From Swiss-Prot:
Residues 246-333 are cytoplasmic. Expressed in spleen, lymph node, bone marrow and testis. Lower levels detected in thymus. Expressed in NK cells, B-cells, natural killer cells and activated T-cells. It comes from the Eukaryota. PANTHER family: SIGNALING LYMPHOCYTIC ACTIVATION MOLECULE (PTHR12080), SLAM FAMILY MEMBER 7 (PTHR12080:SF46). Residues 128-203 form the Ig-like C2-type domain. The chain crosses the membrane at residues 225-245. One of its GO terms (biological process) is regulation of natural killer cell activation. This is SLAM family member 7. Residues 276-294 are annotated as: Interaction with FYN when phosphorylated at Tyr-282.
Length: 333
């Protein structure tokens, strides 16, 4: 029977969500990641029958004076301390951010009272970083722009600077700080503070005198490096030009030497027999070399026989046959 009455009450509550009710002031609540937050209800003026809690229109719990009668699955994260109607949400996550609503029902009031909250879950801030954006040194005055930042930029983070060392402490709002320091002035410590609704964090102090001295040293070193680079570039360019000139000169020298040798060879080979080069016919008469024992004699006579080109008729030939005779060595020219 009790379970049936609870169901009837819960059904009536859902039906009354659409009814226009008196609303309280919207409250903003900030919670740290993995931390906890309490949505407080101050309802001492009226007699409360029950309170219904919702998150972005999702039902969370219904609380009566004698305890919780119905609750969603987040029982380990949602509690109602001291038996009151206020709700405590622990183990916060980023997706817990959103709108929370408490509807208060009383028999003494015809309309329900509504209290709304907006929860934002933030991370704890890390140590801020200080970077040098721009620096200059003119007329003995060193001007440096410092910028402070954290890993949680954009999550409702505000920045401020605190300067300690020159009389009273000075404060500057904003992430960027421009300072001017002259040689001989008293140094000061500059500290950046980053803050969000759940935490604040401080940077490591920086000192303008050291920054300016380091900047001057770096500038001198940079100039020295630039001079060295320029001198090296000039030397390299000179070496390249010298190599090109030397290579071109060697090639031209070899060409002139070859031309000179060619001319000298042409002059050393004169035309000794120009009359033989024109219409020169060369006849080669083959001959057969025969050796006989008589060739070894010390006194050998050679006869040159010229055979005339005479053609005799057959009638003039002698009738007696020719008898072969031995001849000495003959060379026919």
């Amino acid at each position: 029977m009790a379970r049936f009455s609870t169901y009837i009450i819960f059904t009536s509550v859902l039906c009354q969500l659409t009814v226009t009710a008196a609303s309280g002031t919207l409250k903003k609540v900030a919670g740290a990641l993995d931390g906890s937050v309490t949505f407080t209800l101050n309802i001492t003026e009226i007699k409360v029958d029950y309170v219904v809690w919702t998150f972005n229109t999702f039902f969370l719990a219904m609380v009566k004076k004698d305890g919780v009668t119905s609750q969603s699955s987040n029982k380990e994260r949602i509690v109602f301390p001291d038996g009151l109607y206020s709700m405590k949400l622990s183990q916060l996550k980023k997706n817990d951010s959103g709108a929370y609503r408490a509807e208060i029902y009383s028999t003494s009031s015809q309309a329900s009272l509504i209290q709304e909250y907006v929860l934002h879950v933030y991370k704890h801030l890390s140590r801020p970083k200080v970077t040098i954006d721009r620096q200059s040194n003119k007329n003995g005055t060193c001007v440096i722009n410092l910028t402070c930042s954290t890993d949680q930029d954009g999550e409702n983070v505000t920045y401020s600077w605190k300067a300690v060392g020159q009389g009273d402490n000075q404060f500057h709002d904003g992430a960027t700080l421009s300072i001017a320091w002259r040689s001989g002035e008293k140094d000061q410590a500059l500290t950046c503070m980053a803050r969000n609704p759940v935490s604040n964090s401080f940077s490591t102090p920086v000192f303008p005198q050291k920054l300016c001295e380091d900047a001057a040293t770096d500038l001198t070193s940079l100039r020295g490096i630039l001079y060295i680079l320029c001198f090296s570039a000039v030397l390299i360019l000179f070496a390249v030009l010298l190599t090109i000139f030397h290579t071109t000169w060697i090639k031209k020298g070899k060409g002139c030497e070859e031309d000179k040798k060619r001319v000298d060879r042409h002059q050393e080979m004169p035309d000794l027999c120009p009359h033989l080069e024109e219409n020169a016919d060369y006849d080669t008469i083959p001959y057969t070399e025969k050796r006989r024992p008589e060739e070894d004699a010390p006194n050998t006579f050679y006869s040159t026989v010229q055979i005339p080109k005479v053609v005799k008729s057959p009638s003039s030939l002698p009738a007696k046959p020719l008898v072969p005779r031995s001849l000495s060595f003959e060379n026919v020219i």
